[in-house]
A protein has these predicted regions:
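ASCE P-loop NTPase motor core, strongest for the SF2 helicase catalytic module
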Residues: 1-172
Length: 172
């Protein structure tokens, strides 16, 4: 993490760092601020609405604003536009890929002009590795069942489509 963040900082890029644990986020915030001697805001569920907006505005709009923005996965996963980021880090994995994808999407919004690199950290031989395997299997299963996007719907025959959208008479 440090090596990649060194590169991010040296390039003048900005990064989002997501963690699912608020307590870990506080520890990480303290460490990152000491390590790079710069502000690293931490947005969690306990962040007030006004503080939250101030953090987002400073990260997004201030040329001298923070390069690193630490967010709890749940609090930072929805309703934010953070297109200033060109890197997204998932520090610890969440079992539900949709939650991680929503968080990653904070950087992929209308107005994004940067290429965004997504980094997911996994400790070898740990529960995280097992969670990652589960996530990949769930994603593969979802892909096999419904396909990618809306393409699966176009592959249905007319009879299958009619059956899908028709009401059933269950009064027998």
């Amino acid at each position: 993490l440090e090596e990649i963040l060194d590169e991010v900082m040296e390039a003048g890029d900005r990064a989002l760092l997501f963690t699912q644990f608020a307590e870990w986020g506080k520890l990480l915030q303290d460490y990152l601020q000491r390590r790079w001697r710069s502000e690293v805001p931490f947005l969690s569920g306990s962040t007030s609405k006004s503080e939250r907006q101030a953090m987002v505005d400073r990260f997004q709009e201030d040329p001298r604003g923070p390069q690193l923005f630490l967010l709890s996965l749940k609090a930072g996963g929805v309703g934010l536009n953070l297109t200033r980021a060109s890197h997204v880090f998932h520090i610890d994995r969440w079992w539900n890929p949709a939650v991680e994808n929503q968080a990653t999407d904070r950087a992929y919004r209308i107005g994004q002009t940067n290429r965004v690199m997504v980094h997911k950290f996994i400790t070898s031989g740990s529960v995280e590795e097992k969670i990652d395997r589960m996530i990949r299997e769930k994603s593969r299963l979802a892909e096999d069942i419904i396909g990618s996007g809306e393409d699966w719907l176009g592959g249905l025959e007319m009879g299958q489509l009619k059956e899908l959208v028709s009401l059933e008479d269950n009064q027998s």
